[in-house]
Amino acid sequence: MAAGKRRVASLVLLMIIWWSIVSAAESQCEERNDYSRKRPSHKPFTSHQNKQDRSCSSPLPSESCSTSAITPSDSAVRDTSLSRRGLPGMPGDIEWMGFYGSLLAVPTMLSILGIITNYNLGKSYYNSELNAQYYKQSREMLRAHTAKLIQDQEKKFANAGVSWNGMVYGKDGQVNPGAKLPEWNGRVLGGTVANPKSQPVPGSGGAVQGAAAGVGGGTTAGVAAGAGAASAGTGPAQVGGATAGGAGAEAQTGTGAIATGTGTGGAGDAGGSAPVSSGAEQGDAEAGDEARGSEERGDDGTEDRRGGQSEGDDDSDSDGNDEGDAGDAGDAGDA
């Protein structure tokens, strides 16, 4: 589009220049023709006219001078001037060469100037875009390095136990809860906020293991997996330990999940690890039989509680009460 406009402008300018030159040439030609018609023609000098002039120069007034001198015709004068210097006011070869040269020089000059200007503008625009992109990338790089440096330094301070108000990153390099990350034009710089959903849910299911060491080298170990719903956590489990030598240690481990933590054990509403009572002081077979009976009762209670969890009981307090009952049953067995 721009090239077409330049061509039209060049054509219009060319027509204006050509018309002005032609008009000036025509006007000059007319003026010169008028001047050549008005001026007297040069008469060639002849001996006859010389004699006539000498006869007219007589001092006697009675003598009259003859005015019948022979003059060349206008056509002869015109032919003579044409053969010598051409028609007055009519351009010759040199004039036409200059005219055509001027016609060719003007658009050529304009074209060259247009090409140079277009090249310079394009180069300037390209360099401007290049510089802008360079500085933009430099700013982005500096911001990224700054955010990474802040994260590393605050992580080191947090691991060293140093903290301050407005501290963004913690010991693990994650963003502290409630901290505000630096922004630039509405875009957050640096790390991302830790997703709380990625953390393990308190009370989620898993294997629960309890172990106790008996007197005389006897060991008791049991593993029970909670069979309750995932939302309610691991179900309480009781594992009875075998006795060693008739006077070993009995271990009761009640494991269960409460609403506030993932700890094992089921001693009342408080959770945690269940108390392990040792039967080393009693050491008689009757206490061992009573303990075994209490363990059987505890196993029955565990089955009942597991059945309650399978029915979708999510109440943490009721789970804690059941665990408390399991702990009481274990104490009764030890007694």
Swiss-Prot record:
Membrane topology field: Single-pass membrane protein
Keyword entries, A-Z: Membrane, Signal, Transmembrane, Transmembrane helix, Virulence
Basic and acidic residues bias (residue ranges): 289-308
Signal peptide (UniProt feature, chain positions): 1-24
Superkingdom of origin organism: Eukaryota
Amino acid composition bias (Polar residues), ranges on this chain: 69-80
Main location: membrane
Location in or out of the cell: Membrane
Keyword Protease among UniProt keywords: no
Function: During infection, may play a role in establishing and maintaining biotrophy; the formation of a tight interaction zone between the host and the pathogen.
Quaternary structure and partners: Homodimer.
Name of the protein this chain belongs to: Virulence-associated membrane protein 2
Organism: Mycosarcoma maydis
Lineage: Eukaryota, Fungi, Dikarya, Basidiomycota, Ustilaginomycotina
